[in-house]
């Protein structure tokens, strides 16, 4: 941990939040002289204070320890670049249309990668909608967690649960991409 980098980061974040050293110190329960010492690179925050700093500045503790924030390159959030993330502990599903650092349950998440396997499915067009029926058991050990249909400007996300019928209704499928995530078999691009 480089105290100079950490101090510079705390200074920039404090200024962003429009806080004085005294106001920040009062929120954490320390003296303003301590904040001044950190910002000059003459010391680093105690481990017990990192959680408070993280909450006040709304950044990860790791970023405070690293002493720098990296901003993403703005790519316009094109839906062609959509990434899906699934937490292995709680099953939370997250998406992003640009590169992003995502964590859940205290762990950094990587975007799902498409596997070569396909789940067999049938598609019927009914009343301007597409009914997709999957050949899947939908047991607690092996079920489809979600189906997503991505078009150029939007996406449709349907969450499925164990013991539920393995079928979903979507707007009539045209030129988008159809994704499916099975707990056992992984993330698939359906064709």
Label each region the model flagged:
Residues 93-94, 108-109, 186:
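Cys/His-rich microdomains that often coordinate metals
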Residues 82-84, 101, 179:
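Residues immediately within or flanking Cys/His clusters that coordinate Zn2+
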Residues 48-63:
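DNA major-groove recognition helix of helix-turn-helix/homeodomain DNA-binding modules
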Residues 98-111:
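Cysteine-rich micro-motifs
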Residues 1-16:
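A short, Lys/Arg-rich alpha-helix, primarily the initiator
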Residues 18-36:
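Short alpha-helical DNA-recognition segment
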Residues 87-90, 102-104:
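Short cysteine-rich clusters marking metal-coordination/redox-active sites
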